[in-house]
């Protein structure tokens, strides 16, 4: 598979949030400020890239040879949980302000279905280790793009007058829907 097409497809065409609808909880919960969204995007890029690499290696070199591939979901969850703990400890020591801003959403990366979904999708699509890493990294980049763009739009919306009935969740969901339609326009490009 062409690596460039895989990267563009993972980040834009098959965007993990706006096309596959995985990772909606942090997308809606952390996208209030661009700085927080960028921090969450960075954490997800790190975790999803490393998780894709580690889960692919474990799948190809441990689970398949031992005929234990039916355990991939459980093993992948454990790997992702360990990686998130590492990121949490790292952020707490090095960037405490970002750690505080992410709050409860940082541990929720463990249960972020986007991270687990991409790891499982890599296996399901039969990607090799290199392709899994590229797919994981650029799916995470797509996640970061979507959450940062949404945060920027939400900051602009908060500064404007909108009808009372649209304030809060309604305008956020309408905005997310319009973003999904915009990304859907890229569907025929690859």
Which residues are covered by each model-predicted region?
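Ordered, amphipathic secondary-structure segments that act as subunit-interaction surfaces
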Residues: 60-103
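Cytoplasmic-side transmembrane-helix entry/capping segments in multi-pass membrane proteins
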Residues: 35-46, 70-76, 98-109, 165-171
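Structural signature of hydrophobic alpha-helical transmembrane segments
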Residues: 3-18, 66-82, 134-146
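C-terminal ends of transmembrane helices
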Residues: 22-36, 84-98, 150-161
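Helix-coil boundary and interhelical linker segments in multi-pass alpha-helical membrane proteins
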Residues: 1-5, 57-70, 120-133, 187-190
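Interfacial loop-to-transmembrane junctions
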Residues: 155-173
